[in-house]
């Protein structure tokens, strides 16, 4: 076969593999290709200004949700919920939205710093995928999440825009994780959140929940005993996403204990890049906990 033909065939095969790999992931493996989308913020404020002219009219359906990006579509289930729900929240919290307006319009200033976390992750985890980051305005119930469309950041919740790179980093790690099927146990969910905090901190320099960290370190023994007794169940109360305030405990102690598990696993590892891979691709969470050595004296 002529050498030129061989070269053309090789190039074609490489293109097929490249396109196939990109299609399977849906997103690029290059941090430079990730989009940071803030256009939904402008759409929200247009709807908000029109709403203020006549508060009996719900402008958020036609002017925001219907014309929003994939980020708005992805943030709607379980967060924005519906145009009617957003309308009712804005009516009740109109002044709160007004107070954060200036901050939301400055979010694009943090794109360069946020993208730097993507480069840092690429170094630690070459298999990382980099989806779009959508900054949207929601119903004051979520600071961020990730989904099949990408990363979604609730702009109205970001009272300090300097914290945005840390939020983006946390959600970026969630996007890379292998998630367990069904309803995750308290152990699984705590490890998932803790690993997003741990690796997110590595790539952004942003520290996690100070209140949970301080409380956890002060009451560690009691919390370890309680966690071990509950970790195989799916009741997150007093550990994740809410608290009864018993013992004056703060929210999200599961993040704290998950972080500790990950930190111990990483510290024990001789191959740090392999450890990052292991953390993002956990198959057996009980085995992972045992390998970390954390909580050994509490496990029976």
Each model region followed by its residue ranges:
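Acidic/His-rich structured neighborhood in mature extracellular/periplasmic domains
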Residues: 84-213
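Amphipathic alpha-helical surface "interface" segments used
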Residues: 140-143, 216-222, 282-287
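Structured segments of extracytoplasmic/periplasmic soluble domains
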Residues: 44-54, 63, 67, 120-127, ...
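Post-HExxH zinc-binding segment in Zn-dependent metallohydrolases
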Residues: 26-48, 187-230, 295
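Extracytoplasmic/secreted envelope proteins and their assembly/folding machinery
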Residues: 41, 45, 115-118, 193, ...
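Bacterial Sec-dependent N-terminal signal peptides
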Residues: 1-28
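Pan-zinc metallopeptidase signature
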Residues: 59-64, 68, 228-300
């Amino acid at each position: 076969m002529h050498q030129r033909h061989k070269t053309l065939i090789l190039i074609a095969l490489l293109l097929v593999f490249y396109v196939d790999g990109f299609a399977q992931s849906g997103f690029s493996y290059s941090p430079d290709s990730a989009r940071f989308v803030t256009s939904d913020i402008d759409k929200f404020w247009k709807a908000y200004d029109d709403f203020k002219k006549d508060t009996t009219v719900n402008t958020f359906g036609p002017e925001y949700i219907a014309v929003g990006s994939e980020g708005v579509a992805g943030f709607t289930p379980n967060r924005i919920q519906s145009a009617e729900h957003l309308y009712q929240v804005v009516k009740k919290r109109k002044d709160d939205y007004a107070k954060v307006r200036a901050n939301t319009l400055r979010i694009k200033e943090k794109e360069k710093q946020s993208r730097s976390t993507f480069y840092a992750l690429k170094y630690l985890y070459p298999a990382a995928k980099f989806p779009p980051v959508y900054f949207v305005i929601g119903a004051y119930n979520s600071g961020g999440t990730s989904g099949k469309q990408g990363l979604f950041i609730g702009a109205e919740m970001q009272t300090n825009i300097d914290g945005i790179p840390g939020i983006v980093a946390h959600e970026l790690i969630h996007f890379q994780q292998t998630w367990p099927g069904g309803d995750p146990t308290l152990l699984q969910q705590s490890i998932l959140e803790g690993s997003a905090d741990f690796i997110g901190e590595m790539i952004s320099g942003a520290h996690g929940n100070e209140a949970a960290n301080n409380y956890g370190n002060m009451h560690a023994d009691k919390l370890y005993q309680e966690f071990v007794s509950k970790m195989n169940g799916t009741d997150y109360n007093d550990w994740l996403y809410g608290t009864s305030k018993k013992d004056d405990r703060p929210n999200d102690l599961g993040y704290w204990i998950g972080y500790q598990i990950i930190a111990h696993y990483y510290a024990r590892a001789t191959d740090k890049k392999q450890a990052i891979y292991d953390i993002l691709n956990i198959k057996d969470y009980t085995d992972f906990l045992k390998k970390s050595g954390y909580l050994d004296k509490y496990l029976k």
